[in-house]
């Protein structure tokens, strides 16, 4: 970005900031939070950018606020590439009112106390009964991979993802795609795809299963697969999806399209009929 703006003598009305994920093999000389004069900034570039160094092969929590945190790790491709993990902060557990209200009614307690219980607080009733609000629950996790034929470096960060976005560049589709070469097999297509730094749907499905993902979104399809709405294109994309399903097993598999939206429901540990933690007092 910096060089592109400099070479084209472009000036911007506002400023921008660049935080760079540094690989161990990157040229030496720039360390984390290097002084701005040593970095040849563009006039529109903020000096607040950071060089973020790897720790144990990963970039952990390169961004964090009260809602989400973002971590990253390299993925194997023909050139340096990165995958990202977006973690939602723990959220307050859901209250099932019917499990608490009887205790409040029995002791003549103001129902407004439910607000405190919903916040996860512990309250003591008039007879000494202690009601504990629901604990905070893990937030959602989304994994977004770039080009890759092996994303194993991100596996630890990606465990139990609610959704993983994984490329599926090429596929062997006999009987569906009339451009299939007679000599090709599932194995030969996978080896050729890997040699170019990419993945097949089966590879995506296997990795999603390995990390315990709940949903798999396939993307980065070869341009030979148009993804159109005609019957032939739909059949091809469904065949690609089924190849991933066969390896992934349980969970949802979707062939992504541009501008597609997906809502990931919040995690809820509350089981139907499960009693809250109630400690009877001695009063």
Q: Which sequence ranges carry the predicted segments?
A:
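Active-site metal-binding loops of divalent metal-dependent hydrolases
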Residues: 75, 146-148, 168-170, 204, ...
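Short glycine-rich, flexible loops that bind phosphorylated cofactors or substrates
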Residues: 172-173, 225
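A short, acidic, amphipathic alpha-helical segment used as a generic capping/interface helix at domain edges
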Residues: 150-151, 196-210
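Active-site-proximal loop/helix segments of hydrolase catalytic cores
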Residues: 142-170, 176
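Binuclear metal-dependent hydrolase catalytic cores
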Residues: 1-144, 151-156, 224-283
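Short, flexible, mixed-charge acidic loops at enzyme active sites
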Residues: 174-186
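A short helix->loop->beta-strand "cap" motif at the edges of active sites that frequently abuts
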Residues: 211-216, 249-251
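Helical hairpin unit composed of two closely spaced alpha helices linked by a short loop
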Residues: 172, 187-199
